Amino acid sequence: MVSVQKVPAIALCSGVSLALLHFLCLAACLNESPGQNSKDEKLCPENFTRILDSLLDGYDNRLRPGFGGPVTEVKTDIYVTSFGPVSDVEMEYTMDVFFRQTWIDKRLKYDGPIEILRLNNMMVTKVWTPDTFFRNGKKSVSHNMTAPNKLFRIMRNGTILYTMRLTISAECPMRLVDFPMDGHACPLKFGSYAYPKSEMIYTWTKGPEKSVEVPKESSSLVQYDLIGQTVSSETIKSITGEYIVMTVYFHLRRKMGYFMIQTYIPCIMTVILSQVSFWINKESVPARTVFGITTVLTMTTLSISARHSLPKVSYATAMDWFIAVCFAFVFSALIEFAAVNYFTNIQMQKAKKKISKPPPEVPAAPVLKEKHTETSLQNTHANLNMRKRTNALVHSESDVKSRTEVGNHSSKTSAVQESSEATPKAHLASSPNPFSRANAAETMSAAARGLSSAASPSPHGTLRPASLGSASTRPAFGSRLGRIKTTVNTTGAAGNVSATPPPPAPPPSGSGTSKIDKYARILFPVTFGAFNMVYWVVYLSKDTMEKSESLM
């Protein structure tokens, strides 16, 4: 009996010991640290190979995740590393981005010691990836230096992160009506090329506000300021189905500095220069013509150069309107001078015609003419009587002559002749009356002949010199000659006063300032200043930023 009872007790003790041993082993396994596991995994890379091989075993990368079942959701976000430049002529912009896509592929689930499998670009070609393309992209380049810039990660639950670095040149439709005070919303549109929204849709990873990041240092724009960006999504219908399109709008506002220096200030200075001609004398035709032609050619050059930085649009921009108005002011200044010159010439021609017309006849004119004729006849009779008296005086003096030496008489005779000839000639040259000049000349010549006859030889061959040097005859003869000169001068002066018409009035010189110039000096600057005020107030206060909805 005793031996039978001892055997079950020993068996019970051995069972308890075994159970306690198993419990201690299990506790030791549970207390093992993860670091030791990871260390073991590093030491055993064949574990990763085994996991990847198991994932790709029977995997078909031609089929999307959940094929024939639920819709595949692709989450996206964009990080901009460089934005710019923007081309107005080509209407496009360029930027470098990190384009990230995330989706879930349950076929790539795995159970292993590592949370994330960080793989290179070689794995990309072995699994399914979204067929994303940029709808408004003109040229997109994936960087491959020094290796393809792609990132691929697989998580335990089958979530996949696919990132690549791209340089995208996208189209940016621009409405340049308000150029250069304009703003634009340049879109970036992307979506699936083959899968409609019934099979694949796109969403933003971090929501609409934070899914697109553009750091300030990434902007490399010269003519624009990057104000911000907005995101949206839309559905586009086509013959192959409806597709989800994701859109990012980059809002740009143009800088005015370049165009102020290059176009606006030169145009304003050219208009002011054209108005300087209003202050130049209207007789200075070459100077004013040079001002007008030079300013017109300058405005033409400015208008051509301003269009070089723009596409060949069919509508007028804000700068085109400003240049057109400035050109109109410059051209009007040239036309204003042409009008001034034309009306000045007309006034001078009218004044010359008035001067060339004979003065109206006065009723007393015939009476004056008759009086002038009578006066001329009286002067003629007086000159004849005076000539007779002179001849009588010469003959009486020749009878009272004394005998002198022949040499002295000859010299005195020549002196008298020279004086008698010079006196009437000088008087004739200064006398304006033809009647008085003729009568005086005859009288003086007769007196000279009388003196010469006094010295002529006698019939007996002897000379009869006149004694001009006697004291009795010299004063009488001199006084008579003086009276003759006085009478001739008086007669000639009277005839001159009655016969000579008054001198004509000088023609108008046309000097002075034209009334057109006076008005233009005030009208042109005031009008141009008012235009500038309205122009700048309207465009600077106007919201010229394009709305995102207008581009959709």
UniProtKB/Swiss-Prot annotation:
Report the leader peptide range. Answer: 1-35
Which parts of the chain does the record assign to the membrane side Extracellular?
A: 36-259, 306-318, 539-552
Q: Which Gene3D superfamilies match?
A: Neurotransmitter-gated ion-channel ligand-binding domain, Neurotransmitter-gated ion-channel transmembrane domain
Spell out which residues lie on the membrane's Cytoplasmic side: 281-284, 342-515
In residue numbers, the region (Disordered) covers: 353-480, 492-513
Main localization category: membrane
Q: Name one Pfam family in it.
A: Neur_chan_memb
User: Where is this chain compositionally biased, Low complexity type?
Assistant: 445-458
**Tissue-specificity statement:** Expressed in the brain.
Summary of the knockout phenotype: Knockout mice are viable, breed normally and are superficially indistinguishable from WT mice. In electrophysiological recordings, knockout mice show a lack of tonic inhibition in dentate granule cells and thalamic relay neurons. Behaviorally, knockout mice are insensitive to the ataxic, sedative, and analgesic effects of the hypnotic drug, gaboxadol.
Entry GO terms, CC: chloride channel complex; GABA-A receptor complex; GABA-ergic synapse; postsynaptic specialization membrane
* Activity regulation (record text): Potentiated by gaboxadol. Potentiated by histamine.
Query: InterPro entries per the record?
Result: GABAA/Glycine_rcpt (IPR006028), GABAAa_rcpt (IPR001390), GABBAa4_rcpt (IPR005434), Gabra-1-6_TM (IPR047024), Neur_chan_lig-bd (IPR006202), Neur_chan_lig-bd_sf (IPR036734), Neur_channel (IPR006201), Neuro-gated_channel_TM_sf (IPR036719)
Q: Which GO terms describe its molecular function?
A: chloride channel activity; GABA-A receptor activity; transmitter-gated monoatomic ion channel activity involved in regulation of postsynaptic membrane potential
User: GO annotations under biological process?
Assistant: central nervous system development; gamma-aminobutyric acid signaling pathway; synaptic transmission, GABAergic
| Substrates-to-products reaction catalysed | chloride(in) = chloride(out)
Residues that coordinate or bind 4-aminobutanoate:
100, 163
Q: Which residues are glycosylated?
A: 47, 144, 157
Which residue windows does the record flag with biased composition (Pro residues)?
500-509
**Cystine pairs:** 172-186
Q: Where is the composition biased (Polar residues)?
A: 407-422
Membrane topology per the record?
Multi-pass membrane protein
Summarizing the function annotation, the protein's role is:
Alpha subunit of the heteropentameric ligand-gated chloride channel gated by gamma-aminobutyric acid (GABA), a major inhibitory neurotransmitter in the brain. GABA-gated chloride channels, also named GABA(A) receptors (GABAAR), consist of five subunits arranged around a central pore and contain GABA active binding site(s) located at the alpha and beta subunit interface(s). Alpha-4/GABRA4 subunit often assembles with delta or gamma-2 subunits, in combination with beta subunits.
Q: How does the record describe its quaternary structure?
A: Heteropentamer, formed by a combination of alpha (GABRA1-6), beta (GABRB1-3), gamma (GABRG1-3), delta (GABRD), epsilon (GABRE), rho (GABRR1-3), pi (GABRP) and theta (GABRQ) chains, each subunit exhibiting distinct physiological and pharmacological properties.
Instruction: List the protein's name.
Output: Gamma-aminobutyric acid receptor subunit alpha-4
Q: To which species is this protein native?
A: Mus musculus
Which gene specifies this protein's sequence?
Gabra4
